[in-house]
Amino acid sequence: MSALTTRILVLGVVRIFGPANGYQLRRELLSWEVEQWAHLNPGSIYSMLGSLERDGSVERHDLVMEEGGRPVAVYTATPQGIAELDRLVLDAIETVPDPGDALPLRVAINFAPFLSRERYVEALDRRIAAFGLAVQGIMTKQAHLAGNRSVPPHVLAELGLELGLVRAQLGWLVEHAAEVRAGALTFAVEGRVHDWGFEPPADDPGWKMKAESEQYARRLGRVDGA
């Protein structure tokens, strides 16, 4: 897990669910099974929250929810953090340092609905162009090495695997971009923020988190207005 993908995940979940406390954010990310597919260490969530607070991407609010109670640290995304998340998501989609590593794209897709449809498609098109060049590069390398007895056969086999993986992602990208152009997915700027095309089950922990976040928001309103 790179610092980039950790930053996107933590900042993104704050943007979705804030105001929320660190435990809530950790619990939500673990419900996404980020330990498995994103290789995110749960302990790094709190570390990243601190980093995001220091650079102004999130704001920490210490709230006392009941008389005599201990303060609870809750986090909200700042305007700077919102702009930063959009930039990071676009960068993760467009930039292809390693065509064989799809993790930055997988992370970014979770927060693509914050973009406009047009910006998302443009980013996909840039990635498609980069993958087209990557395929050409691998095929050129294959042609150069073919028949060269100084090259171990298993190296050529691995190169074939790399080509297959890159072609597979390129095919998915082309199909996905076409679906989005045709109206697939929902994007926040389209004015349908309450209709994302799915409905979590009644026992989904997210409902409890939503209710708790609303309590924090009401408390923040009273504090800010005091």
Predicted regions and their residues:
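A structural signal for alpha-helical segments
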Residues: 40, 69-70, 119, 126, ...
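Charged, low-complexity intrinsically disordered regulatory/assembly segments
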Residues: 142-226
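Amphipathic alpha-helical dimerization/coiled-coil segments
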Residues: 86-136
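Alpha-helical initiation/capping and key positions within long helical/coiled-coil segments
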Residues: 44, 123-126, 130, 158, ...
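Short, flexible helix-adjacent loops and helix caps
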Residues: 34, 63, 117, 143-150
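Basic helix-turn-helix/winged-helix DNA-binding cores
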Residues: 1-99
